[in-house]
Structures are given as structure tokens and as C-alpha cells.
Amino acid sequence: MCGIVGYVGTQQAAPLLLEGLRRLEYRGYDSAGMAVCGPDGLRVQKAKGRLQALADLTDEGKAMPGVIGIGHTRWATHGEPNDTNAHPQVSESGRFAVVHNGIIENYAELKKKLLEKGYTFRSETDTEVVAQLLDWYYRDSRDVFEAVTSMLSAVEGTYALGILCADTPDRLIAARKDAPLLLGYGEGENFIASDVTALLRHTRNVVYMDDGELAVVSAVGIRIYDERRRPVEKERHYIDWDVDAAEKGGYAHFMLKEIFEQPTAISKAITGRIQEGRVVLSDLTMTDREIRDIGRICIVACGSSYHVGMVGKYNLERMLRRSVEVCLASEFRYSDPIIGPGDLVIVISQSGETLDSMAALREAKKRGARILSIVNVVGSSIARESDDVLYTWAGPEIAVATTKAYSTQMVVLNLLGLYFGDIMGTIDLETYTAMVQGIQALPHQMEEILSDTGYIQAAARELAGHDQVFFIGRNLDYALSLEGSLKLKEISYIHSEAYASGELKHGTISLIEEGTPVIAAATYMPLFDKAMSNVVEVQARGANVLALTTAAGTERMHSRVKNVLTVPETEAMLLPQLGVVPLQLLAYYIALERGCDIDKPRNLAKSVTVE
């Protein structure tokens, strides 16, 4: 959601803050601002809309001299998007500037008390309460650290905070609770940020803050304190990401670039994990006995990661002969789940910071379940709190609509199923071998799909003018349809829903009329005849069908459907890995035809870190 960047060192802060904020644009925002301490004291500039408005207002930061500052891109939660509600929020005295990601749940109560003490408020935000509260405590103590500590004791809710005080222009203070925040270590300069991509051009050495921690950041060092305000030493993580991976590299959009990066991303995800035809997951600490003794398996995730989990349910049940449940993290945490010792909860998250997934993890852990996470960001909160973690190694994913993270999550989940199935003795050698060989072939097969996109672009032009598109599919094709539908609505703003084909007669078919676009996923050949029957069924009501199938089904599908998207043959459980690529491209080209902001679709954020 909101993006935070802070800098203290010897360089001019504002241009660096703008650069960092640009690298956080993908998180979603509606306004931006910066605060810098310089020769003229504490200066703040804010602007509604795109970050370029702030850059123009400050002459790319040159109009705000100073070597220490904080910046923020805001996603409105309290108060409408405007200059006044943008961050940084400043205390009435002008002494404190605060940037904040999260929600202060008791802000109304605190605001009432501050009003009674004579404070006035300019904004509608909960964050202004933090700034005013700091000022109140500072009046008594004249000690910034003590004021921050008192403020943190008073507020309830979630927060990642960057704090700048005009009286101490050589240091920043950072604090975290249930919202991501990290510290970057440089040479004669140090940083704070909500996401490592903001810092990659300046440092690869970072420390991820844990809940309840507070950090004092100066040019000469960083001091970290735990919840009881005792100094702590923390392990630094080296982020081995290619800086250029966070650039477009000649592509029109990050999303298109990341679609085309999927073959390489899959290759990285499986490197070292398949050896001499066997799956080897040396990352795991689970013993063979612990694996054999697994009871229930529950996959917990949000958004596209949830769709990965749906594919995982089908595949893990086939490979492990265990019941697998897949739950939305936002529902799991409130559902009083039947989970406990001996059960395995698999948490899937690209960022490793998704708030609902984090809360679900903690709920499952509290009940005694073992936690295994599949995440992309090394050292992220979910990774740190899991018993085991499998990294996807997808590298930075900038577009809001996920592509390569989805694909790498799925391949890692399939590897996990093979690894467990081998140890449990629940998967036959023929299936195991076919799956391993199929996974190794995925990068080449994806490249084959990506080598010819002209017919997908043509199909996109036919669909771009419609206001709604339906997806249908059975079994794995239903899970695939859900992801295809989500991609389309995310970036093209076309109303789209995915339905299990067998449910058409239970109400959905009433929505089909003359010319209604229906995308029929029919890659799973054991159910191909049923898929064809559903195609005929919707065509009889006037639907204009676009089909997705394998090379084996193309000729038969063409007998009924003009436009057919084709993927290569592979093991049945791997078909969603290939089928998603043409659906990603279709969504991209439709959004392009409609002139949409593909990388930063309206009202969406890359990482959802508030409820």
C-alpha cells in the first residue's frame, strides 16, 4: 500500500527520496509528499495525484535542500485524497513530521484528548494524531526518543512510521507494528523504506524490522531497540536482486516485461531443486517422519496467490492422497479454523508482508500448526515467522498485476508436492517422472507460447470493446479461469467473472445473451468432451466463445470456435502453468487497446498491508 522512504547522509535528500518513491509507485497511491531538514529548518511539500506533480513542485527535489528527509506515497484510508491529507503530516508546532503506513485504530479517542489540550487539526488523517501526540509528549520531556516511546505506548493499531524532528536534524526514527519497514545500511549514509526496491541503487544490505521495534537512524549508524527498548543486534540481509530487473528494459510496461521473464523466473525457481531426476528441497527442515505424519493441509493466501492455492489443492490431493483445504487469508483469520498440532499450513505471498496472510499465519501458529511459507522476498515478515520457507526467486515484480510471481509460486508448490509424495510413498513413479520432466520443460514451452503473440493480440482487439467477459472451466481449468478473469478485470476494468462450467445451469447461464464473450478453458483433456458440451451450451444462447486448449484439442475446438488459444502438451497437473501465459497476454493486450494504466491500475495496490 503506502510507500515510505527515508534518508540521512551527505547527499541532498529530496532527489534521493523522489527516486525511491518512484520505485514504490507500483504499491499504489493517490498523493505524495516529502519533508526535509535543511538550512531553513523543516520544510514539507505535498501534492495530490501522480508523483510527477511533487517532482514538478520541488524542481525534482532541488528546491528542498538538506541531507536528511522522509518521503511518502499515500493510499487514502482516513480522509480523501488531497494535499492536506497527504503525508508527511506535521505537528501544530512545526517540529515533527511523520510518514505512516497502517491504521491508528484509537485515533478518534486520542484526537479528542488533544483537542481538549488546545491542539488544532488541519487534516482528516489518523497520522496527524501521531504528529500532535509526539509534540505533546516532547513538551514535557524535551527528548525525542522518550516522546516517540510514549507515543507508541498510546497508539493502538498497525503502523510503519518514519519520524523527523526539527530539533534533531541528524537522525530519523523508525518504528514498526504489523506493517513492513526495513533499514538500509550504506557508507556514510543510511535509509529506511517500506520496500527494498526503493534502495537497490544505493545499498543491498538491509535489516527487516520486527514488530515493536524502534530504530534511530543517523549517517554514522543505526541503533535498534526491541519492544522493551533494549538495544538489539540484528542480522543483515544481502539482497541479491538485479537492479535492472526493476527497470522496464525496453518494454512498454513492466507487466509485459514480467510476462516475458517467466521462462527465466521458472528456471531460477527450479535451479538446484531437481537433481538427477529427483526433487531435492534442502531448504526444508522437516524430517521424513514429520512429513509422513502430516495430518490436514491448509493453503492460505490472497488474490492470485489464492488461485495458486486452488491449483495446489487439486495437485497436492492427487500427489499426497491427503485432504487439502484452500482458504482466503482474510476469512481464515476470523473463521475459528479447525487446525492444530500435526497439521501443515502453507502460506503463499509474493511480498511476504500481506497483512491478512500474516494474521492467518499467526492464528495457525497459535493453534499449534506447522507453518511452511512460499514467498518471494527474502527475510520478509512471513518468511521470518514461518517454520520453513521456500523462496520463489522471482526477483522484483513491479507491475501491480502479478505474473511471474504467480508462475513461480505454482512451480514451487508442485515441487513441494512431488517432494512430499516421494517421501510419503503416495505418488507412482510414472507420474513422478512425468511431472519432473514436465517442470524442466516449462521454460522452453513458455518461450514457445511467447514467440507468437499476434493471434492473441487479434483476439484482444475483438474483446476490447465489451463491458463484460465470462470465463468457464472445470477442475484445474476452473482455477485457471479464476486467474484469467482476475487479470482481465484488474487491468482492463472490464467486468469479468469466472464460473465452474458444471454450475452454468444453476443460474450463471441466465447472464448469457447474444454476443456475450465467454472464454472457455479446456486444457484438461480428461474433461475435454464436457468442456466442448459447455461451449455448445453457451453458443446456443448466443455467446461469442474464445477457447483455450492444448495442441491435442485444437482441431476439435476449431470445429466449433473461430478463435482458439493453444498451449503445448504437458502433464495434466502442469497445464495451468502454461495456460496462464496466453490469458496474461490477452488481459494485457485488451488493457492496451482500452488505453488503461496497465502497471498501476486504479484503486489497486501491489502489497496489501492494511485491513
PLM region spans:
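Conserved short alpha-helical segments that host acidic/polar catalytic motifs at enzyme active sites
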Residues: M1-K248, A252-H253, T264-C298, Y334, ...
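Glycine-rich oxoanion-binding loops at beta->alpha junctions
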Residues: V67, G71-T84, Q275-R289, G312-I348, ...
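Generic C-terminus detector
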Residues: R229, N544, T570-E611
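Acidic/histidine-rich
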Residues: V155-E189, A464-E490, M525, M532
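Glycine-rich, anion-gripping cofactor-binding loops and their flanking helix/strand elements
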Residues: L182-Y208, S330-K365, K505-E537, E571-Q584, ...
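Active-site phosphate/pyrophosphate-binding segments
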Residues: S153, Q262-I266, I270-C298, D388-P517, ...
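Glycine-rich phosphate-binding loops that contact phosphosugars or nucleotide phosphates
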Residues: R292-A441, A521-P526, K530-L565, L586
